[in-house]
Amino acid sequence: MALTVASCGNASDPKLNQTGATPDLPKVNETLVPPMKISPPAGWNGETPTVPQGFTISAFATDLKIPRQMLVLPNGDVLIAEGRGGHAPAMRPKDVIAGVIKKQGNTKIKGGNRITLVRDANNDGTPELRTVLVDNLDAPYGLAYVDGYLYVAEQGALVRFAFQPGQTGIATPAERVTELPSRINHHWTKSLTASADGSKLYVGTGSNSNIGERGMAVEEERATVWEIDRATGARRTIATGIRNPTALAIEPTTNLLWSVVNERDELGPQLVPDYLTQVRDGAFYGWPYSYWGQNRDPRVMPQNPEMVAKAIRPDYALGSHVAALGLDFARNGGFGGSFANGAFIGMHGSWNRQDPSGYKVVWVPFNAGRPAGQPVDFATGFLKDGKARGRPVGVAFDGNKRVLFVADDLSNTVWRIAPAR
């Protein structure tokens, strides 16, 4: 049975459109204690997620230690970041309750704090090699490979290792590229990707609170995306007010940077939509003062109408509380057909609404480098009979082998999706 904390007026309206460029935004429904419901874990029992007709899905790697983000190397090896971070203390009684609720839906496995390498050289879905590439890391999350270096975004620093595809181990110590904001670490994950030409790295850092309730002093350099010059290490902030940019990726037809973002809680089951957006240089996305552009959050004190007036709207709503954690784009024609151009998005799933949202991988079609249509369920079945069998995190597309990998940090599995042969 799901562990639940109910509150008045917590039902969702199925008639509201929660996705796309123009989502319906209902009235604010603030309650003393927000509705909370987590689906308890259950095993797969030999079953797998459900994928569209014409595709197959299989377990590529099992018994991992909290797989998060992944990286497909030029030679096809798959790197898997494993770990758990964060150490923010609870401030309010409802924070304690929320922490208890969330734990019911998480794995009890201790995070590996490592990167695992898996090799399937002949692309038959059965790896020939699995090994720990490097361990003793500090909650690794984002990964990037550029010009002989593997970059790892830990919860407190961006580090790099001298590395060439084909290696199966790293013995040299990490070189620190730059410190990353790590005070409190309410949102500890640090997303990472490289620019198309490899000259720049991008790091996303989440906020230290829901809506600034810890004070704005601890939000310095939080809720941001940084651009880091790979040659000099110099960094600059390119986006602010972007509450929790959990995954970054380059759209391949335009070479522009995109992110999935987790929005704020406790305004009701259908506020605020998590979103997919192009990360625009100099943009302010509203947090904490407003949401979805210039919709003012009445809870934030003091109010800041000047900042609200600067806020821009994101590009594409994904639904409220879906907890989008994974993002990658199809390349080299993707899977072809309906899945040739667009974004794969891993949705970890909700904890603060009575009817669950997320718990799946969706496909957002693109045309001319922009979202072009409603999201399509691509991998489902992570919820069954009110229980969670898995929770998607990172997604990684191999454009050469036409394979999509999905990290599942509840069953500690990486799933492999490919066209049926």
Language model features with spans:
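Beta-propeller domain segments
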Residues: 9-51, 89-91, 97-106, 110, ...
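Short coil/turn segments that connect the beta-strands within blades of beta-propeller domains
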Residues: 75-76, 147-148, 197-199, 254-255, ...
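C-terminal motif of bacterial Sec signal peptides marking the signal peptidase cleavage site
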Residues: 4-7
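Short loop/turn segments immediately following the C-termini of beta-strands
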Residues: 75, 83-85, 155-157, 163, ...
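Asp-box/WD-like beta-propeller blade repeats and closely related beta-sheet repeat scaffolds
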Residues: 126-149, 154-196, 207-210
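Surface loop/turn motifs at the tips and blade-to-blade linkers of beta-strand repeat domains
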Residues: 59-64, 131-138, 177-184, 237-241, ...
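Residue position within the beta-strands of beta-propeller blades
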Residues: 79-81, 152-153, 202-204, 258-261, ...
